[in-house]
């Protein structure tokens, strides 16, 4: 999801993404070279 400023409602310029498999992650990291920004990968599963 995209993170928004609480006061203005505008995007803060970053977000969080969850991948169900490595194929989706591979697609994003490949396209990162085309200017989608920085990608960080954490392979630990988190439960909320």
Curated annotation (Swiss-Prot):
GO molecular function: RNA binding
SUPFAM superfamilies: RNA-binding domain, RBD
One BP annotation, GO: miRNA transport
Domain of life: Eukaryota
Ion transport among keywords: no
Statement: the UniProt record of this protein carries the keyword RNA-binding: yes
Classification via Pfam families: RRM_1
InterPro entries to which the protein is assigned, alphabetical: Nucleotide-bd_a/b_plait_sf, RBD_domain_sf, RNA-binding_reg, RRM_dom
Keywords from the UniProt entry: RNA-binding
Signal peptide: none
PANTHER family: GEO13361P1-RELATED, HETEROGENEOUS NUCLEAR RIBONUCLEOPROTEIN A0
Protein name as annotated: Glycine-rich RNA-binding protein 2
Organism, as annotated: Populus euphratica (Euphrates poplar)
């Amino acid at each position: 999801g995209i993170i928004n400023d609480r006061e203005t409602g505008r995007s803060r310029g970053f977000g969080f993404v969850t991948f169900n498999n490595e194929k989706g992650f591979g697609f994003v990291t490949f396209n990162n070279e085309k200017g989608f920004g920085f990608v960080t990968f954490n392979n630990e599963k988190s439960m909320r």
